[in-house]
Amino acid sequence: MSTVLSERRRFLKEILLHKAREMLARAAELLYAEGAEEVLAFASVLKPEGFDEHSDVDIAVKTLTEEKKLSVERKLEDIFVDIAFDVVFLEDEIRSEIRERIQREGMTWKR
């Protein structure tokens, strides 16, 4: 019985991760269209075993104007309708441990 439940849970996690990555691809498309120089994903969305219903999608963005940042955040909310997300803009002041984590494990999301 527990094998059936664990398999079901694993299957649902895979579906959720796939959905999150599809949303990430749409978000990256939007960000590049708005002028981002680079879009990076980091943290649990890159780790299939670590992504679950409590996870969010972490995105780092390089080079967007201040006015674009605000409008982009609103548009991202429309993309990530039922999955939480965090976006950081690399030209802003961010905590050093977050910046180091992005540099260490961030993956450029292609256009």
Predicted feature residues:
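Catalytic core of pol beta-like nucleotidyltransferases
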Residues: M1-L40, L46-E53, L64-R111
